[in-house]
């Protein structure tokens, strides 16, 4: 059973053949011919291909995504209400800070971090809304960035996922070490030849990265998350959108 999907389309490719049976980390989408998939239709096509290869679209899952609109729409259109989306909190913070002068970034960064550390959904949302209100007058673009998709950054709060596991699932960070190791392998290649060889080099990179894999934080609580997702009804897993 696959219960959690991490997607960060600015990362390296992860061939489907090397995915875990329980946890999927999707990097940059490549099709079978090695073509980079950044637009909606191609990302949607890849997800449909996963279904043809055995992925059950009717099973509720938690999808951890960055802020990319194409992958967000593709997941929604393919998996519908069974897709519970957790937007990456790290990407959200980074986007908000990009609209602020350097003198303001540290304070806002700390405030957002403390807000997301709240266990209860209402407390976290209240603090984030307060930050947005404080930014609205002087930095309206930063405030708008914070409010855009805010609910989806709080999916782990609404599910009441325990602390250690929540730290893992609140962002796309768990895939970064694997991506870094893969990039280290690919960086040595001066000529990929063709798309097939590009995929082979990517696979080799992730096999090398696998040697350094460790248990994720909160791994003992994964069964709790699985039960939470299995027990969700259609009405309770749907996250409001801004």
Give the predicted meaning of each segment:
Residues 34-56:
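Active-site beta-loop-alpha junctions of metal-dependent nucleic acid enzymes
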Residues 35-39, 63, 85-88, 100-104, ...:
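A generic short alpha-helical patch detector that favors 3-5-residue windows
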Residues 35, 52, 80, 97, ...:
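Amphipathic alpha-helical interaction elements
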Residues 41-44, 72-73, 144:
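Alpha-helical elements of the RecA-like P-loop NTPase motor core of helicases
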Residues 1-33:
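N-terminal low-complexity segments that are often proline-rich with Ser/Thr-Pro
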Residues 5-8, 40, 90, 200:
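Intrinsically disordered, low-complexity cationic segments
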Residues 69, 118-242:
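Acidic/histidine-rich catalytic cores and adjacent linkers
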Residues 60-69, 74-113:
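Conserved beta-strand -> loop -> alpha-helix junction used to position metal-binding or nucleic-acid-contacting
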């Amino acid at each position: 059973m696959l219960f959690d999907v991490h997607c960060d389309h600015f990362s390296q490719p992860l061939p489907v053949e090397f995915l875990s049976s329980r946890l999927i980390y999707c990097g940059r989408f490549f099709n079978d011919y090695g073509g980079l998939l950044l637009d909606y239709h191609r990302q949607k096509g890849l997800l449909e291909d996963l279904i043809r290869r055995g992925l059950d679209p009717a099973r509720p899952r938690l999808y951890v995504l960055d802020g990319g609109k194409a992958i967000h729409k593709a997941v929604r259109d393919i998996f519908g209400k069974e897709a519970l989306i957790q937007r990456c909190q790290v990407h959200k913070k980074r986007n908000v800070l990009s609209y602020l002068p350097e003198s303001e970034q540290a304070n806002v960064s700390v405030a957002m971090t403390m807000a997301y550390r709240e266990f209860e959904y209402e407390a976290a949302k209240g603090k984030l809304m307060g930050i947005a209100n404080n930014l609205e007058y002087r930095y309206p673009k930063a405030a708008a960035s914070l409010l855009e998709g805010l609910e989806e950054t709080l999916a782990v709060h609404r599910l009441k996922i325990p602390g250690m596991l929540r730290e893992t699932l609140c962002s796309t960070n768990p895939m970064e070490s694997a991506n870094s190791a893969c990039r280290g392998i690919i960086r040595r290649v001066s000529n990929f030849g063709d798309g097939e060889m590009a995929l082979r080099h990517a696979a080799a990179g992730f096999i090398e990265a696998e040697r350094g894999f460790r248990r994720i934080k909160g791994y003992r609580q994964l069964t709790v998350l699985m039960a939470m997702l299995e027990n969700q009804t259609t009405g309770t897993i749907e996250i409001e959108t801004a």
